[in-house]
Amino acid sequence: MASKYSVTLAAEDGYSAAFRGFAEAAEQMQENIRGHQAELRELNRLGRQMDGYQSLQGDLAATAAALDDAREKQARLSREMREAEEPSRRLQNEYDKATATVAGLSAEHRSQSNELDRLQGSLEEAGVDLSRFADEQRRIEEATRQTNSVLEDQRARMQAVSDAQARVTAAEGRVAANREARSQLRGEMVETLALGYLASRPMNSAMDMETSMADVAKVISFAEGEREQYANANLRLASDRLIASSGIRGTDIADIQYAAGQSGIFNEMEGQERFDGVMEFTRQAAIMAAAFDVSAGDAGSAMVSWRQGMNLDGDQALQLADATNHLGNNFNTTAADLTELLVRQGSVATTAGLSAEQAAALGAAFLNPGTQREVAATGFKNFILRINQGAATTDKRREQWNALGFEPEELARRMQVEAPTVIREVLQAIRAAPADEQSAITETLFGTESIGAISPLLVNLDAVDKAFNEVSDTARYSGSMLREAEGVADTSRTTWNVXTAEVARLVTQVGNGMLPVFEAVAPPVTAVIGYMADFTEANTELVGALAAGAAGLVAVKAAVLGVRYASLLIGQVGNQGALMRARLDQRTAQTALAADGAVGRLNAAINRLGGGAAGGGRNQRGNGSAAAGAAGAAGAAGAAGAAGAAGAAGAASRAAPGVQNGWRAWAANVGNSRAGQVAGKVALPVALTAGAIGVANAVGGGDAADVGSTAGGLVGGMGGFGGLMRQQMALGEEFVFSLGSGFPYSSLQRRSDGGWIEIDITYASPSSQNTGQALEQIRLSGTAFYAAGMQRLDELRAMQSERRPYVLVDGLGNNLGRWKIMSVEEQQTRVIDDGTAMKVAWVLQLEEFVDDAASSDDDSG
């Protein structure tokens, strides 16, 4: 198809150039008319001269006759005078009068003779054969009539050009009107899409909230109406300034409730009591998320882990959150990192004898040097566990503990009573050892993976004392998290977030009212779209894309607008076609005028050369007619398209019959070869493009013969290309894969196996061995629809049962050889109540057929 587009673009460029040259062609035509008018005036002048010449000849003849009569009378009177010897006065007077008359007539005769000679010279210069004056006079009259006829034809051509221009203007007006209509329709589409978007926003918000609460319902058994109660409370909670500062939405708050429900903390509660407990937990976790700059889901999970892992109630968890926030503000760490460490190892610390706040303090000390969270958490765990190991301590560690002055059992006991003191003493004892032994002691007691977390503590034991001191008094950190959240909430961004949350609540409530309507409208629309999607999937060559619009009335309006827009596009195609035809008519009229003008100028030039011999003049005029005939014949050949090209080839072969058997036979051999076929397909779009450019150039030059020949070649080439494009894949003579036959294929896979295998060799690389090229395989697949396509499947099976090979020809007319039908597979779907399958996916497996005994030219099948 790419070649076809190239030709079309070139042709359109030619028409555009023709339209732009309309003014120049009209001006040239006016110039031609002025030339013909000048020639007509010249012919009229010659006619008047010939009329004067003929009249003067008559006057000259009358003058000569009168002169003869006067001379005869003079002679007679002279004789009478001589006879009378004494002429009378009367006779003398008459004689004098006759003499004067003779003198006057002689002068007039000389004048008329001179004028006659001048006219004869002028006419001879104009090519008038005075030896055949009557014929020349008739020729001039005929030329004058023909010139007048040409002028009338030119006026008609001018009118045709004007009509063509009017059609072009009308077509352009229709194009502009269509464009304006499509622009207006696009505006309606944008408006509809905007309405659809505005309508979808509430439904999307409502569906998002509905989905989030459906997840919560998996872990909390809601009674009737409770899901909506929780959802509404979440939307209101999202607009709380302490929570809105972090941009938490109602769906995010549902993640906190999911964590609470999954933990089972509120499973023993029912109704309003559970609602109050869950919402209080949710509010605390949401404030924690805003203060700690973590997600709502992570804050909820952390709260649950603290309460379950460290056996805390709600107030204790809130107190731990305050301590964590306070430590994060006073140490080189963040509340979020410390929260994660406590989620991982908080239960280990409280089991070993630390309170939740003391565990947070020790965690802050481990994180303070900038230690990574994972390393600090590992060192924290190993440090607490090994100190609290007691009698389970290994001999090697016991020996090391004794060297430091500790008994493992005593350490474990004291940890349950005075854990911070024991931790300080252990760290001080390790620090008191020689510097080169501290790492070895740490590795022996707590493991290699703990060195990176414990060694920084030995350098700065004051940080440990400071951490424990920060949580020793509740007054120091109580309410720290709430104050942090209030500080973040006191910003314009929070005000904006509150307004956004309220708008989201309104939009969600509107969407809740729209969802029942959507649920009623969506199923039938979805069923139709599903069938269209199946059809699109099976007919990708016909359908480019299928888009579903919004639900309800918006979807219906979008569909109507789509149909209207498509009809306008189709109408625009018609308008463009009319515009192209009008421009072509205009260019055709201009070409005809140019051709007529060229022929007229040729005849006039030949006629002006007619001053020579009569025979020569006729020969030259005959040649002019032949030229005109040649131009007309060329134009006819151009209109005939390929026939003109064929006629030219035939003329060439007749002109040189000896050459025909040479180059034509050679060309036939090359054209029938494989290389010739490939070259022909490659050269076809190039030739069509060149032909379109040639037509445009010929039209611009005004050469009728050139226009006819180039246009004929182009039309013939396009006809050949159209014939090529009409070919379709066929298997044998019976079966064609096409839309028209109800059985198109959607994909073709061709496999060629080179026959290489690898042979394993002991203690060496494998060896490649070629066992001979395997037979090629082709796999065709597509979708057949009820009921014509299923009949074609039966035809394929009937061909398979004949157990013979078939010739396969592709869509470009290439013979792919003979192939065996190995299998015909089908899968029936969309089965309706009576068992009829509305859709059948099929696969045809072909394998190359090789018969050494058969002739290579045998393509039957």
From Swiss-Prot:
Keywords: Coiled coil, Viral release from host cell, Viral tail assembly. Residues 20-127 form a coiled coil. InterPro entries: Myoviridae_GpU, Phage_tape_meas. GO terms for biological process: viral tail assembly. The keyword Chaperone does not apply. Serves as a base for tail tube protein polymerization and acts as a template for tail length determination. PANTHER family: FELS-2 PROPHAGE PROTEIN. Belongs to the P2likevirus tape measure protein family. This is Probable tape measure protein.
